[in-house]
Structure formats: structure tokens, C-alpha cells
Amino acid sequence: MSSFDKNDERAQLMVPKSINEGKVVKLSQKTLVTKKIERQVVPEEKYIAGLDKIIEKDYFPHLKKMQAQKEYLEAVANKDINKIKELQMKFCSTGSVRTDRSFRTPITTRSTTEAPDVSSFDADTPGPSSASTSSAHDWMQSPMPFANEEGDNEALNRKRKKKKEETLTSYLNKYTSEDNASFEELAKVMREREDARRPWVYKAEEEHNKNLVTRQAIAAEADVQLALKHAVDADDNRPLNVDNWAYKAWNTVLFNPDGAALTPAEIADAARKQQTEINKRGTRFPDSGKLKPSDEAMTRAAVSHALANAGKVDFLGNEVTPANSFKLLETPNPNPDDMDSPLMTWGEIDGTPFRLDAPDVTEHSLPGAAPVFKIPEVPYREKIAQSMNDSIAAKYRDKRKVAMRAAEGAHFSRTPGFGSKRVSDKLAQLSPAAQKLATKKLGLKMLPAHKSPFASPKIMSNWSRPSSSKRSTTPGSAWSRGSTTPGSSWSQGAQTPGTPGIESMIRRKGDNVGPSTSAGAADRANAGDFF
């Protein structure tokens, strides 16, 4: 029997199949696990101070210079001479001390065997010559510049390692504050509490996703699909779950979705964007704007120079023009005591020299700056005149207010009291019902004009009252309730003299109504006055 026949027999035998046979396992994408960055926890004050130092160094290098100028201007305003001297000595370089030439000394202290550096002195300052120095110098006692302490020549190849300056990103990756560290610890504790409170949720998710096997056909690998087909009589032992369905505890139905997975191109783009690049030039003006004046400023300077030299001649009698108009300049002296020059310093801040009492950048010096209108300050004389004018105007306003109050008090008097002529006229014009109401409720006694019971009541007046009346006739008491006190109002039957009553207004029988009436009859009211 050949080997081929044996193989055919073996193929006809039923071999038990495993559970996972016929299943396609889809491997997940490999994930790169990186080491967690451990930051050093520092106090809050130290952390903030380090951030301030790096930000000032990298993004605002001119801040130190501006702070010095601010301190100087405040010292000048407060007339603090000690502070001014301190700032001058602080920002004055060691090579240019503002002292007399005769008192200038070398800055650094040298040994007796070492020759002083001639370059540290000024050109006009006499110093030791090189010949005398070389004759007195002992070369055996001086260290060799080409050898180290042991005498080897290895020192020539050794270079001091330059200290790497720390950037803002490296500082944030290396250090963290106590507040940030405590917050991360609290967040970690909360996550652990959540896992301990609902372990069944996260455990079920982990078990399901670990045993998940996808059985979806892969169209790109058709030959693999044909090789992994199940036999017709084989049992289907597949788990009763949906194909390609991963379980997640925080599902997208009840919670916000995390979003679709990123493609390789998007991952590469995100990694490239994580490399932060800070434009430090955007935090300051360019130096060319401070040093180079604008074209408008140069044009204005040329025009003003030409107008100032118009009609002038030089020592040869030629007219001075802008082309050949040069001035004689004096040799600058760094000592401000000799010349009235502005206080300057030769420092190591930004530029040498710079003025402490004036800004470096002006609005007119910037390129493309437009002309600026500036209102001059009010002169001191104008301020005094304005204050005097305001004080005089305030006095006049006070006098006017006092006069207006006096006029208002005289014009707007009190409400007329009862018993006056105007009130009596109004009461006389009332209806009988109103007069009855005044009699009962207000206590006014209304006397009838005639004996007839149907006659209209009347208010007694001083003119019609008989002389034998026992009621009060005190002047000034009107419509009083039987009171005889002078000045009391609402007296019963008492009226101020001169007040007309109803009796004088009613026409009696037999009165003469013709044109030849008397003076008393002419003052009586007509019937038409009541309608």
C-alpha cells in the first residue's frame, strides 16, 4: 500500500473538532504603553516663582529694564537721592565707573605675581609698560595656560559643559505644585471608589471584551474563509451573542459618545501638533522699529532743519544748506557733573547706553506711525484764574438761593383761615342741605333771615347783628364755637368786621332796585349771581 492510500484512509476518519475551530480571531491594534511622567512636587511659592522667571526670561526680556526705569522715575519724583545713586551703581558696568580719571583703579583684585591687564585701563590713563612687567615677572611662578593642575595637557581638550537652559515645557514636565499633586491624588481616589462601588459593571465589561471573538467574514481573504468552513454535520457551539458587538459599561445611549477611532493619518497629525512651538517674537516689538526712524519723521526733520537755516551764512559767507550744515560737537564726557547731559548708564540689561528717565520707543519712532495730536497741559496761571472764577460763581449761587427762599416764603402764604371774605362768600353760595350739614356736623349756628319757618337760614354778620348781642365780637375771631379767645376760629355768630353775610345779599320787599339805589344797596348781590 502506497503512502497516498494511507493518507486517504486517514482523511476518512472522523477527528473530533475543538470549540474554537472555524472561528476567525481578529487581533486588535497594538498599543504602545509609555512610562508615566513623574513630576517633582515643589511648594506653591517656589513653583510660581520658577514659572515667573522662565516666562520673563523667554517672553519678556525687556521687563527688567522697564522695572529699573520705573524705579528711577519714582525716585526722581520722590526726590530720593539715595535710591537714584543706588540705581546708577547697580546698572553701571564695572568697566565704566563715573569717577575722575585720577582716581580710577582696576576693577578686579590681582595677585602680586600676576601682571595687570593693560586693556582694562582707559587709553589716556598711564599704566605699567609691558617691558617692565615682563622683566619683573617670574615665569616659573605663573601657572601654565596649556596645562592643568597635574601638569597634563588634557585640559586643552576638555570643555566645560554648557548648562542647558530650561524651557517652559520642560519645567512643566519636570515640576508640579502641591495643589496640582493633591488634585491628582483626589481624582485617583475617586476612581478607586467608583471601581469598588460598582465592580460588577466593569468586571462584566472586561470579561466580555476579553472573550469576544468576531465571526464576520473578511472579504479580502476569500481563501481563508473557504478553509475555515464548518462541516455540515458539525454541531454549532457558537455563543449566543451578536457578532462584532463589544460591550461597554458607559454606553453611548445613556452617556456622551467618545467618538470614532482615529485613523493612522489622524494619529500622526495629532502627534505632530503636540509639538508645541511658541512664537517668542510676538511678545515684543522688533528692534528695527526702535532704531530706525520713520520716513515721515525724517521728512519733518529735513524740512525743519531747512527752515531753521534759511538765510544763514557760514564763516566764508556762503549760505548754509542742509547738505553742508554740520555742527561742531564736543567730546562726550561720561561724568554728568561736568556737562548737563542726561543721566545715562552703560549697563548689561538690553542696550548700551539707555536713558533711565525716558522710554526707548516713542509713537513717532515706530514705522508707519501717524501724526499724533497732543493737547498741552493747562498753565498754572489759568488754573488759578479758573479756581477764582469757580469760587466767585459759587458765592453768587448761594446768595441767589437765599433770595429765592425769602421770596417764596413771602409769596406762598398759609392757606386762608375760616372767616375770611373768600371763605364766607363760598359758604354763602352753598345749598340749604350743605348749610344744614355744616350746622349739625361742624357746630355752626345758622340763623334764619325772617321769622318764616320756610325762610333760608343765614349766617349772622356783624352788620345785621343787633347791638344787644351777647356773642363775642372780638376782632379777628371768626366762626368759633362760642369761644371768646382772640384769634380763635369758627365762632358761632362772630365774624371779622368787613365780612358780608347772607342777610346783606338778600333783597327785601320794598327795596329800591332802580338806577338811583344807595351805596349800600349797590353792594348787594343780585339773584343772577347765584345761578
Swiss-Prot record:
It holds the Pfam family Es2. Residues 104-163, 453-531 are annotated as: Disordered. The keyword Repeat does not apply. Keywords: Nucleus. InterPro entries: Nuclear_protein_DGCR14_ESS-2 (IPR019148). Residues 125-136, 464-477 have a biased composition (Low complexity). It comes from the Eukaryota. It is found in: Nucleus. Residues 105-114, 480-498 have a biased composition (Polar residues). The keyword Nucleus applies. GO terms for cellular component: catalytic step 2 spliceosome; nucleus. Belongs to the ESS2 family. Regulates pre-mRNA splicing. This is Splicing factor ESS-2. The gene is ess-2.
